């Protein structure tokens, strides 16, 4: 990412959770440990189905004495409805934000510069009621700012940032192996651990029970993780959703997200991933190759 560019993410939704049972309520649902927010002020987390299938992912932030969930705008209502369904007798209030917010991504270099200028030691801080934080998934994904929409132009000017096309950020995330848009195509189609939650700091098996915990623990603790969500790059033809990927006579994957940044659920054993990761593969009627991120061992 370019140092002085801000990638405006106008496709994000915001949900506030407040009430005396908020912490316990979220702890019983989310894949990550909500207690970490006391130290770090934020976490990356997910919600799974009772079977351990992927449903949603988001950042959770302690903001203005409430919990703020920042997620894809298209799924914000679904996430809010899901949480309200599980609320039962918990003393919590869950609602999409009525105030207008906007998120934007910035480079790690710029984030560290802002942090230093404001004499902050932590990777999360608030300036003028706007949130600044380092992406907890991967340091290479830089920093993020969640601001009141009315403050956007002022922040850009004050921080010497120039607004740029969000597609450049999505492309950067793709190259780092992290899907950023069209995540709804993953819903109920693969296990949460197959989405690399443990590697991207979105899963804590030591926290205790959460929705989908039983199957998730079984897969991880018994070393039964056999597939991972990985980026794929077109060589020729057109990649289509649900296309089967083949290596020699073996089915080694299936396309989950086709456009604009393609991701597939890929076998990592039987055959071993290293045998075909840099090989031209058949994908439906197209040819592709798998892009293995550095953080995948």
Where are these regions (language model features)?
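Acidic, low-complexity central loop/insert segments
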Residues: 5-9, 14-16, 59-176, 247, ...
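Solvent-exposed residues in well-ordered beta-strands and their adjoining turns
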Residues: 18, 72, 107, 148, ...
């Amino acid at each position: 990412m370019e140092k002085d560019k801000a990638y405006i993410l106008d496709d994000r939704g915001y949900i506030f959770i407040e009430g005396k049972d908020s912490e316990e309520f979220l702890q019983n649902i989310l894949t990550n440990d909500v207690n970490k927010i006391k130290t770090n002020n934020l976490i990356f987390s997910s919600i799974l189905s009772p079977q351990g299938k992927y449903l949603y992912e988001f950042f959770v932030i302690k903001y203005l004495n409430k919990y703020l969930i920042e997620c894809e705008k298209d799924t914000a209502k679904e996430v809010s409805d899901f949480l309200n369904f599980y609320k039962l007798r918990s003393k919590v209030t869950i609602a999409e934000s009525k105030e207008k917010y906007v998120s934007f991504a910035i480079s790690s270099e710029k984030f560290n510069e802002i942090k230093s200028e404001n004499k902050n030691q932590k990777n999360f801080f608030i300036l003028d009621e706007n949130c600044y934080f380092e992406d907890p998934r991967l340091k290479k994904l830089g920093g993020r700012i969640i601001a009141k929409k009315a403050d956007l132009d002022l922040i850009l000017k004050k921080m010497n940032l120039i607004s740029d096309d969000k597609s450049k950020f999505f492309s950067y995330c793709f190259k780092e192996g992290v899907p950023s848009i069209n995540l709804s195509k993953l819903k109920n189609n693969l296990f949460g651990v197959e989405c690399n939650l443990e590697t991207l700091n979105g899963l804590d098996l030591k926290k205790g029970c959460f929705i989908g915990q039983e199957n998730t623990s079984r897969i991880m603790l018994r070393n039964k993780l056999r597939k991972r969500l990985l980026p794929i790059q077109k060589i020729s033809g057109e990649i289509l959703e649900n296309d089967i990927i083949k290596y020699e006579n073996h089915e080694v994957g299936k396309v989950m997200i086709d456009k604009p940044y393609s991701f597939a659920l890929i076998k990592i054993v039987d055959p071993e991933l290293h045998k075909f990761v840099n090989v031209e593969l058949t994908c439906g009627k197209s040819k592709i190759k798998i892009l293995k991120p550095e953080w995948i061992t």
